[in-house]
Amino acid sequence: DGVRLTKAQRSVYPHNDMSGLENALREGRSADRKLIITDGVFSMDGDIAPLDEIVDMAEEYDAMVMVDDCHGEGVLGEGRGIVAHFELQGRVTVEGGSYSKALGVQGGIIAGSEDLRNYALNHSRSWLLSGSQPPGVAAAQKASIEVLRDEPQHVERLWSNTNYFRDELSSLGFDTGVSTTPIIPVMCGESRVAQQLSRKLR
């Protein structure tokens, strides 16, 4: 929706298809500014973006990278997210995230350079008239980051539970797709079967 509001020219490349991305970058080579936008972890299938390849390609074509890491924070990179997972600190232009998933609070995160943050705060119409977070929420956000930093056992337990759950589903014959994260889909093949399974789980 944000891209539509900017009225910028946009290209959509097939899911995680690096040759498709490169074709789009070639076609837009003459543009003054280019921004590649991707999820870090895809919420439907639980697979992750090849962010290392995306960043390499962005640098080759002089493009910026924005990653929405709502489902990677608290999960990948010892809980620090997909940028840390691929050791790309300092090479991603904008990181977006959420406190409402793994961190269990509310609110969102936009991280980038100081210039980028100042520009966004002063030019984004949707932010100009919005209020600040209540102090209690800000304190809870800070505490959630401290827990993530100081208590790595939570991320370790998450992965232990994830691997156990996936292995048990597979042993029962369920297809869990291509997920490599704690988002584990169960492929049912058709909606009728999915609805029946859902009813039995209630």
Residue ranges of model-derived segments:
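Active-site phosphate-binding strand-loop segment of PLP-dependent enzymes
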Residues: 11, 15-67
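Active-site PLP attachment segment
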Residues: 84-119
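Structural motif of enzymes handling amino- and sulfur-group chemistry
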Residues: 132-151, 157, 161, 170-171
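Helix C-cap/helix->beta junction micro-motif
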Residues: 6, 60-61, 172
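Substrate-binding/gating loop at the entrance of the active-site cleft, primarily
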Residues: 1-6, 19
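A short glycine-threonine-serine/GTX helix/turn-capping micro-motif
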Residues: 106, 124-133
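Conserved PLP-binding catalytic core of the aspartate aminotransferase-like
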Residues: 156-165, 170-202
